[in-house]
Each structure stands twice: as structure tokens, then as C-alpha cells.
Amino acid sequence: LSEGLRAAIRVGVGRALYRGGIVETLLGSIDARGVSVDSVLSMLATCFSRSVAEKLNVNNIEVVVELYEDLDALLDGDVNNVNRLKVKIRVEGATREAVEGALTGCPFYTMLRPKIDLEWG
């Protein structure tokens, strides 16, 4: 937390225990070699789609999260801006504005928003 007196409540927790090549998580045991960037991005897509589906009461939504590295930022030595996420969303029966509003209620989206390029359709 930042400077000064602040109040905070825990809204979630993740746990992982690595032991002998196996990672034990709240979702079960996973072979550590099976954990990849793609699996983490899939979990982010799951969080985003759930947030939109629940807030907008829609049943058909597709979310794709892609990780990109900005080579210009890398070459410029701007390591804080090298990684970017592209989030592509398709939702039937909802406007772009409604979807963006629903995403702002997702804590992961809010934390990562400065690094996200949102695409519609």
C-alpha cells in the first residue's frame, strides 16, 4: 500500500505450492511444465468474460487476450512499456460502451487497463 494510513480489504487470494515439478493450486495440481503464458492469458480471458456476462446478463461472449511485446519500446529501453495486452471481445446484444463499463468492474481489467488495447467485434 502507498504512504499514509489506508484501509484495505482482501477480495481474493491465489495460492501455489511448487513441489517436485508439480504446482498445487486452488484449481488442483498442475505439472509445472504445463503452466504457460497462454494458460495465464486464458484465465484473464475467463475473468473478463465472466465479468461482462454477469453484469450485462448475456450468454454468448467471446474474449481473446493476446500478449505482445513492443519492440520499439524495447529498443528505446522503455522496459515499463514493452508488454501490451490486446483484448478482443465479441458480444451479442451489447454495445461497446456497455461492455467497457462492465469490464471496469473487473479488478484484473482495472489493474491492467493502462497496458490493454481493447478491440471490439
Write out the residue ranges for each language-model feature:
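Extended beta-strand/beta-hairpin segments
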Residues: 1-43, 50-121
